[in-house]
Amino acid sequence: MATYKVTLITPDGEVSYDAPDDEYILDSAGDAGYDLPASCRAGACSTCAGKIVSGTVDQSEQSFLDDDQIEAGYVLTCIAYPQSDVTIETNKEEELY
């Protein structure tokens, strides 16, 4: 199991923590004490949406985002595993509509 540095740019500021590559970013953020927005926790809505600034994730389990949104860097943190050090802007649900 690899561990990566996850940096979250939230409306309240920037936070970083170490996350395993086999745990969803939403869950590892919660384990690290950071409360991110979430609803379905299954990749089927947009409540937990963020936008990748740098790095890569595996979000192959998601069913909500279209190809254009994924290419633009949007990510559903509830079903995304870090695959490198990654920086994500959180609270991006409004931008999807």
Curated annotation (Swiss-Prot):
Domain 2Fe-2S ferredoxin-type: 4-94
Record CDD domains: fer2
GO molecular function terms attached to this record: 2 iron, 2 sulfur cluster binding; electron transfer activity; metal ion binding
Keywords: 2Fe-2S, Electron transport, Iron, Iron-sulfur, Metal-binding, Transport
Superkingdom of origin organism: Bacteria
Metal-binding recorded as keyword: yes
Cofactor field: [2Fe-2S] cluster
Cofactor: how and how many bound: Binds 1 [2Fe-2S] cluster.
Binding residue positions for [2Fe-2S] cluster: C40, C45, C48, C78
GO biological process: electron transport chain
Keyword Transport: yes
Quaternary state and interactors: Forms a complex with heterodimeric ferredoxin-thioredoxin reductase (FTR) and thioredoxin.
Family according to the record: Belongs to the 2Fe2S plant-type ferredoxin family.
Biological role stated in the UniProt entry: Ferredoxins are iron-sulfur proteins that transfer electrons in a wide variety of metabolic reactions.
Family matches, as NCBIfam families: fdx_plant
Name this polypeptide is given: Ferredoxin-1
Organism: Picosynechococcus sp. (strain ATCC 27264 / PCC 7002 / PR-6)
Lineage, broadest ranks: Bacteria, Bacillati, Cyanobacteriota, Cyanophyceae, Oscillatoriophycideae
